[in-house]
Regions:
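Intrinsically disordered, low-complexity Pro/Gly/Ser/Thr-rich segments with frequent PxxP/GP/PP motifs
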Residues: 408-433
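Cysteine-centered iron-sulfur cluster-binding motifs in ferredoxin-type domains/subunits
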Residues: 103-118, 206-221, 257-303
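Hydrophobic alpha-helical transmembrane segments in integral membrane proteins
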Residues: 346-370
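Membrane-embedded alpha-helical bundles of multi-pass integral membrane proteins
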Residues: 1-245, 296, 309-342
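Short, hydrophobic/aromatic beta-strand segments
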Residues: 392-400, 456
Length: 465
């Protein structure tokens, strides 16, 4: 009995690598066309929004402020605390389902049109680099060639500093950022280190790592096999129309030959030369394709030149390429995802509408959780954080419901400005005999001057009995 014969798999390396494993540096040609124009408008619009949002004030707060040290998050005037776990969970789930839906419908449109990696690289860093390269080649002698890299990396550094500061503003607010920028780094070494590290990472990414962020690091490309289906929008090459490839196609097209030897693809390589990740779109759907449509603009320009119809490379679907049939809009994914998304948004709206203007949080004070004072009783410092989500200043009366617990508050009632969060320390004193197994539970009640009430249970730590 003959042993089975297995075909050896076709060897293939990443498009950013040479066959010997060394890196293949890409310098994609910029192909002008209708999609590049639209992408530029979208890209610069997103950059403008990204830079402007931290400076826009709604209710006295930044439009978006992810205050991680303060454990609060502001979204267009709405303040969420770390205790708003249900709201945060529903919001994150809604974002994920939206990504699933958009991917099922539009493929990797986010990667090619909205991802910061693509937007900054293709509309900020790379255009400057290519403009300086043209300037250096146009000059005589070696002066321009020597100066161009210095100018390039100087501009790259300036871009990275601006983007890094803008990025940090989302986490620290522009008020803190403005203070840090006008002071010596020695007065705030921690934030200065974070900013420097962020600038360094951006320089490394956009000056060196580049497309490898999309093809090697980013997990979204690897998710597309699960998120895409045969009807999802992709950038594809019409093999039935384009094959077999050959330069002879030009003569056949221009002469109007009926019985043709070649397809419409003249094998010019324009689609490969313009691809920012270095792939050949004619090889079919690939992990590295970001759906930017640069190959579409490049191929359309060639088709116009030789007098052939455009669309040899186009936004399409696997179903359309294989069968010629139109993509199906209504299918299991596109029906299930909107239904789930609608349910999540309704639940989110319900939870948000039931959120009161008062929210409190009890936090264990850093350091020793309790001390035994002279009379033998146990005193526990507890941090109380109050968020005033109303549009007016509120006074909050603080009380402990257990009668055997003595509370000392520095300020009571405690004032909090509108749309602000403030903290105070409560000193709670109780008998050591009330602790069972080293802890006991108390209830803290906070009532606002407008009548809103919130209560929280908290576990005090004490001596073991």
């Amino acid at each position: 009995m003959n042993d089975p014969v297995f075909a050896a798999p076709e060897e293939r390396v990443l498009p950013t690598l040479n066959n010997d494993g060394t890196r293949r540096w890409l310098n994609p040609k910029r192909s002008k066309g209708r999609f590049l124009k639209w992408r530029a408008l979208v890209g610069w619009g997103l950059i403008a929004v990204f830079v402007a949002l931290p400076w826009i004030r709604i209710g006295g707060r930044p439009a978006i402020w992810l205050n991680l040290p303060g454990r609060e998050f502001t979204f267009f005037g709405k303040v969420l605390l770390s205790t708003d776990t249900l709201i945060l969970m529903l919001g994150m789930l809604a974002i994920f389902v939206t990504i699933f839906l958009l991917t099922a419908l539009l493929g990797r449109v986010w990667c090619g049109w909205g991802c910061p990696q693509t937007v900054y690289m293709e509309f900020l860093y790379r255009p400057v680099e290519q403009a300086l390269e043209r300037w250096a080649k146009a000059g005589r002698g070696s002066t321009r060639k020597a100066v161009a890299p210095i100018i390039k990396y100087g501009l790259f550094l300036a871009f990275s500093v601006v983007l890094a500061h803008t990025f940090l503003a989302y986490f620290v607010s522009t008020d803190a950022l403005r203070v840090w920028m006008t002071q010596s780094p020695f007065e705030h070494p921690g934030p200065f280190f974070v900013m420097t590290a962020t600038v360094g990472l951006m320089m490394f990414d956009f000056a060196y790592f580049r497309e490898q962020m999309c093809t090697v690091i980013c997990p979204y490309a690897r998710l597309q096999s699960a998120l895409l289906d045969r009807d999802s929008m992709i950038v594809g090459f019409d093999e039935k129309r384009g094959e077999p490839r050959g330069k002879g196609a030009v003569k056949e097209i221009r002469k109007g030959v009926t019985e043709r030897q070649y397809g419409d693809c003249i094998d010019c390589g324009a689609c490969v030369k313009t691809c920012p990740t270095g792939i050949d779109i004619r090889d079919g759907l690939q992990l590295e394709c970001i759906g930017c449509a640069q190959c579409v603009d490049a191929c359309d320009a060639i088709m116009v030149q030789i007098g052939a119809p455009t669309g040899l490379v186009r936004y399409t679907s696997q179903r359309n390429l294989e069968t010629g049939l139109a993509s199906r809009l209504l299918r299991a994914r596109t029906l299930l995802y909107p239904a789930v998304l609608l349910g999540l948004l309704l639940a989110l709206a319900l939870v948000v509408s039931n959120t009161t203007g008062l929210q409190m949080e009890l936090i264990r004070n850093p350091g020793a959780p309790f001390t035994v004072i002279e009379d033998g009783r146990v005193q526990s410092p507890v941090r109380l954080r109050i968020a005033n989500r109303d549009a007016s200043k509120e006074m909050y009366t603080i009380a402990v419901l257990e009668s055997d617990v003595e509370m000392l508050a520095p300020i009571n009632p405690f004032p909090v400005l509108p749309n602000e969060t403030d903290s105070t320390t409560l000193f709670l004193t109780t008998s050591a005999d009330t602790f069972v197994g080293g802890n006991r539970t108390i209830t803290v009640r906070v009532e606002s001057s407008s009548g809103q009430v919130d209560e929280r249970r908290f576990q005090l730590l004490g001596p073991m009995r």
